[in-house]
């Protein structure tokens, strides 16, 4: 496991450093956070506990708490967070080529939330990131790569002067990255594009996922990374059973429930008014829990679920497990608290498991339906 090197801050210096990060702009704060993680400056208080360990899809994880996509697009800090207590991580999301949409980020500290106004995925492009994945391929950490596309018009995108179908684009990205990761997440969750509507259309979704499976088999027959699908929180009650049926038909390995929530569709009162954009953080929790429980029921517990969104405490994590999630991803809380959030949530989850007499987190999965 990768160990950061450098001078480690004591608790007092960390508190001062983190106070400073909170006072500067989100962009510069993120740069300092990344520097602290990469340099090994942050104190590491994580203590392993056998109750947290879990086995899923052939992976042995020391904790179900992982780092979600959106936190690390540079392949720079997820491995450091795994060293500091996360069980796994996910890079991205990446589009095939670089995208630099105009993006505004608002930290809603009173609401424990972030609002992002963007019509795409700001990233340097998967093609440009492949060398970074090659460089870290010998690390033992369990990591995934989140791949996405931004719809330019119905059914196809224009790339490098030619028309490329969604199936082709997802397959190309999968072939590029499959040899260097443990799982691939096909992301349909961007609420500010119509692309997420694909998930309820079997004629579009199933061929895409079967193409991705074929690409994995061709590019990484030995590693054979697992395939997850990230579905949006904004689907309707009528669409969700269809989506679950499509996922089972396509034969994917699991589903990621969550991601950002569209403010234009969610009736959430925030301390500051924002009429457009994508919301992440604590206010997403009720939506995530509701969808986890429904997906768990519709798939009869046969499809592993990763909860993504709204987790701020060990109690939140336990509620996700009880609703049917096997793993949990955090992201927004890391931007507010830094790496100590990983240690805190793990510790709180252990305390809850002890108090309820559980010997492992797996005993809590789907507890609401037992």
Where are each of the predicted segments found?
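Active-site glycine- and acidic-residue-rich loops that bind
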Residues: 151-170, 197-199, 204, 228-249
């Amino acid at each position: 496991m990768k160990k950061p090197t450098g001078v480690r801050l004591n608790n007092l210096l960390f508190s001062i450093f983190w106070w400073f990060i909170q006072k500067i702009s989100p962009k510069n704060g993120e740069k300092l956070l990344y520097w602290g993680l990469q340099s090994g400056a942050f104190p590491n208080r994580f203590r392993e506990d056998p109750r947290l360990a879990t086995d899923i899809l052939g992976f042995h994880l020391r904790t179900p708490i992982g780092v979600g996509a959106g936190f690390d697009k540079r392949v720079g800090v997820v491995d450091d967070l795994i060293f500091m207590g996360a069980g796994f991580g996910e890079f991205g999301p990446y589009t095939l080529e670089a995208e630099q949409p105009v993006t505004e980020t608002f930290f809603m500290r009173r609401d424990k939330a972030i609002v992002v106004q963007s019509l795409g995925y700001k990233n340097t492009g998967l093609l440009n990131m492949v060398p970074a994945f090659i460089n870290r391929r010998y690390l033992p950490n369990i990591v995934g790569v989140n791949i996405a596309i931004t719809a330019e018009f119905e059914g196809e995108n224009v790339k490098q002067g030619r028309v490329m179908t969604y199936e082709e684009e997802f397959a190309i990205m999968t072939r590029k990255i499959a040899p260097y990761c443990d799982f691939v997440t096909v992301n349909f969750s961007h609420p500010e594009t119509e692309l997420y509507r694909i998930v309820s259309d079997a004629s579009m979704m199933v061929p895409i996922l079967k193409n991705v499976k074929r690409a994995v088999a061709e590019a990484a027959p030995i590693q054979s990374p697992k395939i997850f699908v990230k579905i949006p929180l904004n689907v309707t009650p009528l669409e969700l059973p269809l989506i679950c049926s499509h996922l089972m038909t396509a034969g994917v390995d699991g589903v990621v429930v969550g991601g950002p929530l569209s403010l234009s569709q969610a009736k959430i009162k925030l301390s500051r008014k924002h009429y457009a954009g994508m919301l992440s953080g604590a206010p997403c929790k009720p939506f995530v829990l509701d969808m986890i429980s429904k997906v768990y029921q519709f798939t009869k517990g046969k499809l592993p679920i990763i909860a993504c969104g709204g987790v701020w405490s060990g109690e939140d994590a336990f509620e996700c497990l009880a609703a049917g999630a096997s793993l949990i991803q955090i992201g927004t809380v890391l931007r507010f608290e830094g790496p100590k959030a990983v240690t805190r949530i793990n510790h709180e989850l252990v305390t809850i498991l002890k108090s309820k007499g559980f010997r492992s987190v797996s005993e809590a999965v789907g507890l609401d339906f037992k």
